[in-house]
Swiss-Prot record:
The lineage of its organism: Bacteria, Pseudomonadati, Pseudomonadota, Gammaproteobacteria, Enterobacterales. SUPFAM superfamilies: Type II 3-dehydroquinate dehydratase (SSF52304). Catalyzes a trans-dehydration via an enolate intermediate. This is 3-dehydroquinate dehydratase. Pathway: Metabolic intermediate biosynthesis; chorismate biosynthesis; chorismate from D-erythrose 4-phosphate and phosphoenolpyruvate: step 3/7. Homododecamer. It is an enzyme of class 4 (lyase). The keyword Membrane does not apply. GO terms for molecular function: 3-dehydroquinate dehydratase activity. PANTHER family: CATABOLIC 3-DEHYDROQUINASE.
Amino acid sequence: MKKKINILLINGPNLNLLGTREPEIYGKKTLEQIVNKIKKKSILLNVTLYDFQSNAEHKIVEKIHNCKKNNIQFILINPGAFTHTSISIRDALSAINIPFFEIHISNIFARENFRSHSWMSDIAQGVISGFGNYGYQIALKTAVKFLLEKEK
């Protein structure tokens, strides 16, 4: 049997409001529905998926800091509005040396000007933006493929 892969999914501020917050941009599914769907997919891929959501920057930083001791091999992060403001989350991701994908439900590059800059994209393994909730599944499948290729 293959070794189990540990992936952490982090969702940032206001993503707890998915389903009711601007459904024309973010869709009608709740964060719980999105996470449940990706957790089902993770089982099929032999992945243990841990999920975490916070509106507090320092809690996200602490969660990232703990990734090494928790044997996390890959991070999927939708930083929400912290994408455009948080150097501390960027620094935390850079410090731990664990690959990550930055995920956005909407296409941040096709929205307001202030949303088009990401403090994390240049250190991310990749950015998945504008695919709606399906972006989470793309990120999960691609992270697994990345880790399996890295093992070869």
